[in-house]
Structures are given as structure tokens and as C-alpha cells.
UniProtKB/Swiss-Prot annotation:
It is a multi-pass membrane protein. It comes from Bdellovibrio bacteriovorus (strain ATCC 15356 / DSM 50701 / NCIMB 9529 / HD100). The gene is murJ. InterPro entries: Lipid_II_flippase_MurJ/MviN (IPR051050), MurJ (IPR004268). The keyword Metal-binding does not apply. This is Probable lipid II flippase MurJ. Pathway: Cell wall biogenesis; peptidoglycan biosynthesis. The keyword Cell wall biogenesis/degradation applies. The lineage of its organism: Bacteria, Pseudomonadati, Bdellovibrionota, Bdellovibrionia, Bdellovibrionales. It comes from the Bacteria. Keywords: Cell inner membrane, Cell membrane, Cell shape, Cell wall biogenesis/degradation, Membrane, Peptidoglycan synthesis, Transmembrane, Transmembrane helix, Transport. Belongs to the MurJ/MviN family. The chain crosses the membrane at residues 98-118, 146-166, 170-190, 201-221, 246-266, 284-304, 328-348, 360-380, 395-415, 422-442, 461-481, 489-509. GO terms for molecular function: lipid-linked peptidoglycan transporter activity.
Length: 523
């Protein structure tokens, strides 16, 4: 094996290993988050869960925007370039200090404005029908004021995560949000009489959790001697380069995430519970999405940025192709499983306390539609770093604008026919357009991905998925034998059979992803 081929193999392993570390940390956090959501559905009625979900949308938007968006994709390439040009790390530290100082000023002003003007902000993003319920409206405003401080902490966390990712640390930043979920769980179970208003604890749990996850990464950066410090000189050439790349990316990612606000606005005009149904289905969608696509995309960006800086086009292309195929290989069975087992999954997880059978049916209907979008959104999440790594943030921005325009235009039309489900279908159409355009324009703006390389493995994935679908029918057979009392066991056995069927068939069909997953999980 040549030195170049050996190097490429190590680079691929590095990306997959980084993604595996991120996925491991994310899995821990998501499991805790799932317990939190189960408690939320069982302990609080739909008026409180709607209020909390609506109030959390804004700070959560900033979490997604900065934590999975423009801050990392614009900062990491410039940070890595300064490191390569100055091995001492002094320029990289100066960049981190200057940008951090600028970020703190921006976040301080943003948080203060959000707290002061929370009412007009929520009148903008929620329909007028929502405010007709005075008690729910006041609770939403109260929670919004408490949780807006989370924006400051979560954006600080996202910046710290970007530095650690650039330094090759992926596991701890992915694990840190577990502290957020632990905090929210603790506050969810606190006695209601401890708070002035029923539901306040949900908001305080978010705020304290945001502080804890930022502090954890601050300790990690201090140990590496990269903890940013305040400085007077803010507008350095490197900061200018980050901001130039950040603005289009901020708009592009903002437009993609803005679809959640579009859903919130339209859903707030629908019957009570609609906002909560979207939230619970979205949480189940985010589990495979964050474990697979976000982890791969975040791990891919530093590696591709390095290849782009060194002009290694072939390495760039082959690593991108392998990462895209790995995403398809894992997202495809997740989408199939969520679609076919939507209702039993919701029943096992949530059907208790104040979560009713009607809640199960409505949430499951949304989850099935989200399962279709999982493949599309996951592909987009892996394709976008291919643009960002060559410092092109404008194309994803324009494409996000196109898909958002489609969603906003189509949603009211489909809602008249199918209500809440029509709103979700509109989002799927928009996601399809975004993914197709990202793939179609890729070769023009980066080394790209060769379709000929994708077709044969993708066909194998489809065949393995077909076998998995057959194995999923075991759920109905098991339920006929065991009854509702052992539903959780029946669901667990069915999922286990499906996993064995998919990966077993993939192995028989010769899917290389099996061996790559095994190697990446080794220390």
C-alpha cells in the first residue's frame, strides 16, 4: 500500500472515529433527554407543555443555529488555517480571544433585548389565536423571559465546542448537553409548590443546564491552555474572515432552522396540543439525526477544511463520498424503523399519566411524516460541510431561502386539506428540494461527490432495508401472543430483530460500512 493510500485510510478512520465519539456522547445526552420528555408528557397537561414548547423554541433556535450551524462552520476553517501557519498556536489563541470578546458583547445585547421585548417577539412568531388563552399566553411569556438567558450560555458553549473540535476533541463537547438534560429532569420532578407558577421549574431547568454545559467545556479548554480571554482588540483580520464567512452561513442555517418557527406559527392556530405533538415527534427524529448526520457532519468539517487548505482534492472527494455513504447506511434503517413502528414507539415511551391515546395517535402521525424527512435532512446535514470546508457559505444560504419559501407558500394550502399533517408534509417537500439542490450544485463549487460511486452501495442498502421491513412485522406477531402487558418487550425484541436483519444482510451483501464501523469503534 502506498504512503498516500495509507494516509487516506487513516484520514477516513479519523473522521469515522471522531463521528463515533460524538455519537457516543450525543447518545447519552439524548437518552436523558428522552426521559425528560417522557416526564414532561406524563406530569403536565397540554396547556403547560404547549407553553413550554413555544417558549423554548427561540432559545432552542439559537442552540441549533450556533451549536450546529454558522459559528462552527465559519470559525473552524479559519482557526485551523491560523494553526497551520503558526504551529506555536499564538495566532489561533489570539483569534479565539478576539472573537470571544466580540461574541460576548453581541450575546449580552441580544439576551437583554430578548428578555425586555419577549412579548412583541412572541406575538410575531405565534398566531393571534394562541394569545386568546390568557393563562397559557402569560405562562409562555414568563417561561420565555426565564429561558432567554439560555441563549447566552448555549452560544458560549457552541463557541467552546468549535475550538475543541478544531483541536481534535469531539467526545466531551457532545456529552456536555447531558448536563442540560440532567438539570431539566431534576427541575421537572421538583414539587410545583417550590415555584411561584406551575411550570416555572421547566424554564429554570433549561437556564441552569445551559450554564453547566458551558462551564464543563470551559474547564476542558483551560486544561488545554485555550480558554478564551477578553481583549480590547476585536476586529483583527482573522476575525473579519470568520465574520465574512459567518454572515451568509448564519442566514443560511437560520433559514433552515426558521422552518421550526414557521411550524410553530402555523401550529399555534391549530387545536391545543398541536405544538406539543410536533415537539415530541421532533425529539424522536433528532435522536438518529444527531447521532448520525450531525456527528458525521461535525467530524467531517475539520478534516475537509484541512484537505481544502492543502489542495488535496482527491482525498477531499473520497472522504466526502465515504462519509455520505455512511450517513445513508445508518439513516435509511432509522427512517424505516420510525415509520413502521411509530405508534408502538410512542405508546411505550409516552402513554402514561396525562398523555392520552389521542396524544399517541397524533404524535405518531407526525412521526411517520418526519421519518420520511429524516433521509432528506440527514443528507443535507452531511452535504453542507462540503461547501463550508471550501469557505462557501453563500450557496447553502440561497438554497435554504428557496426551501423556506416553498415551505411558507405550501403549508397554508396543505393545512386546509390535512391540518397538522399538511403542515408537516410541506416541510418534507421543502427538505427534498434543499437536498436535491445541494447535491446537484455540489460539483460546481467543491471537488464534489461522484454519483457513480454511490449507486452500487445505495442499492445494497435498499435490499438490506427490504429485509429489515419484513423482520419488523414480527411486532404484530409478538403482540398477538403476549398482549399489551408485554408491549415494551415485544417492541424491544422487534427492534433487535430488525437491527440483526439489516446489518446481517448488509454483511452478506458486502457493504464496506460494516467493517468501517467496527474499526472506528476500536480504541
Amino acid at each position: 500500500m502506498s504512503h498516500e493510500a495509507s494516509g487516506l485510510k487513516e484520514d477516513r478512520k479519523k473522521v469515522l472515529k471522531s463521528a463515533f465519539l460524538m455519537a457516543s456522547g450525543t447518545l447519552t445526552s439524548r437518552i436523558l433527554g428522552l426521559f425528560r420528555d417522557i416526564a414532561l408528557g406524563a406530569l403536565f397537561d397540554r396547556a403547560v407543555t404547549d407553553a413550554w414548547t413555544a417558549a423554548f423554541r427561540i432559545p432552542n433556535l439559537f442552540r441549533r443555529l450556533f451549536g450546529e450551524g454558522s459559528l462552527a462552520v465559519s470559525f473552524i476553517p479559519v482557526f485551523m488555517q491560523t494553526q497551520s501557519e503558526d504551529p506555536t498556536g499564538d495566532r489561533a489563541r489570539n483569534l479565539a480571544n478576539a472573537f470571544y470578546s466580540l461574541l460576548l458583547v453581541f450575546l449580552g445585547v441580544l439576551t437583554l433585548l430578548g428578555i425586555v421585548y419577549v412579548e412583541p417577539l412572541f406575538r410575531l412568531i405565534l398566531s393571534s389565536d394562541y394569545a386568546l388563552d390568557a393563562a397559557k399566553w402569560e405562562l409562555t411569556l414568563r417561561m420565555g423571559r426565564i429561558m432567554f438567558g439560555f441563549v447566552f450560555f448555549v452560544c458560549t458553549y457552541a463557541f467552546y465546542m468549535g475550538i475543541l473540535n478544531a483541536l481534535g476533541s469531539f467526545g466531551l463537547p457532545a456529552l456536555a448537553p447531558a448536563l442540560l438534560n440532567v438539570s431539566m429532569l431534576v427541575f421537572t420532578f421538583m414539587p410545583p409548590q417550590w415555584f411561584a407558577v406551575h411550570g416555572d421549574g421547566l424554564a429554570w431547568g433549561v437556564l441552569i443546564g445551559g450554564l453547566l454545559q458551558a462551564l464543563l467545556l470551559a474547564v476542558a479548554l483551560k486544561q488545554r491552555n485555550y480558554l478564551p480571554r477578553l481583549q480590547k482588540t476585536l476586529w483583527t483580520p482573522e476575525v473579519k474572515a470568520v465574520v465574512r464567512g459567518m454572515l451568509p452561513g448564519l442566514i443560511g442555517m437560520g433559514l433552515l432552522q426558521f422552518s421550526t418557527l414557521v411550524n410553530l406559527y402555523f401550529a399555534s392556530s391549530l387545536p391545543e396540543g398541536s405544538i406539543s405533538y410536533i415537539y415530541w415527534a421532533d425529539r424522536l427524529l433528532e435522536l438518529p439525526l444527531s447521532l448520525i448526520s450531525v456527528s458525521i457532519g461535525a467530524a467531517l468539517l475539520p478534516t475537509l477544511s484541512d484537505f481544502a487548505n492543502r489542495g488535496l482534492k482527491e482525498k477531499f472527494q473520497e472522504t466526502a463520498e465515504e462519509s455520505f455513504l455512511m450517513n445513508l447506511f445508518l439513516a435509511w434503517p432509522a427512517a424505516l424503523g420510525l415509520y413502521i413502528l411509530a405508534e408502538p414507539i410512542i405508546e411505550v415511551l409516552f402513554l402514561r399519566g396525562k398523555f392520552t391515546v389521542q396524544d399517541v395517535q397524533m404524535t405518531a402521525a407526525i412521526l411517520r411524516i418526519y421519518a420520511v424527512s429524516l433521509l432528506l435532512v440527514s443528507c443535507s446535514r452531511v452535504l453542507m460541510p462540503l461547501y463550508y470546508s471550501v469557505k462557501n457559505t453563500k450557496v447553502p444560504m440561497v438554497l435554504a431561502l428557496v426551501s423556506l419559501a416553498v415551505h411558507v407558500s405550501l403549508a397554508p394550502v396543505l393545512m386546509r386539506q390535512w391540518g397538522l399533517e399538511g403542515l408537516m408534509i410541506s416541510g418534507v417537500v421543502a427538505a427534498l428540494i434543499n437536498a436535491v439542490l445541494l447535491m446537484g450544485l455540489l460539483k460546481k463549487y467543491s471537488p464534489g461527490i461522484r454519483m457513480s460511486v454511490l449507486l452500487r452501495p445505495a442499492l445494497k442498502f435498499v435490499l438490506a432495508g427490504a429485509g429489515m421491513v419484513i423482520s419488523l412485522q414480527a411486532y404484530e406477531l409478538l403482540m398477538a401472543q403476549t398482549g399489551r402487558g408485554l408491549q415494551m418487550l415485544a417492541l424491544f425484541v422487534t427492534i433487535l430483530l430488525a437491527v440483526v436483519a439489516y446489518f446481517g444482510l448488509a454483511y452478506v451483501l458486502g457493504c464496506e460500512q460494516i467493517s468501517r464501523i467496527r474499526r472506528s469503534s476500536q480504541p
